[in-house]
Amino acid sequence: IYGVVDGLFVSNLIGTSALSALNLVYPVIALVTAISTMLATGGSAAIMRKMGEGKPDEAKQDFTFLILVNVLTGLVMCGLGYLFMGKIFGSMSLSPEVSAYCWEYLSRYLLFTVPILLMNNFTLYMIAAGKASLSLLCSVAGGVTNIVLDYLFIAVFGMGLVGAAIATVCGECIGGFV
């Protein structure tokens, strides 16, 4: 939903070049989401198996290990993103305006790769722990936060794609704080 919300605000308040940039960086965002989902799904299954076997201490160790894996994965993804971002955009024959918009959005988004991975994982861990209502609350809070902040940052403060990126990562990370 974050991409749809950003797209609506960006297309109506910034313009088509900014929307093009948003669409060009979306595969990177989808990759972050896919890796996060992979870690969360496998991790929650491993943790719940240990809990079902009556091994809560091992489940806690797995949880701690998975948090470390998420942090390291997020740091690597952020580093690789910054390392290759210029080369990827440079190879696309983009207009200078679209290229700048891509950089504006993705450079801010990548800074929050670690908390995004952790939040996505915590959401699935909550479901696995029988706290589906809390997981839903976190997801709804994140979506509402994104909508409100997109409006404030883009329409009110005129922050452009930087504002859209910040609104998105705030929305995605809010679940970790709820």
Where are these regions (language model features)?
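Alpha-helical transmembrane segments of multi-pass membrane transporters/permeases
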Residues: 57, 70, 125-151, 162, ...
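Small-residue-rich hydrophobic transmembrane alpha-helices
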Residues: 19-79, 116-135
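Generic alpha-helical transmembrane segments of integral inner-membrane proteins
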Residues: 1, 5, 35, 71-83, ...
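Short alpha-helical transmembrane segments in multi-pass integral membrane proteins
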Residues: 47-114, 156-178
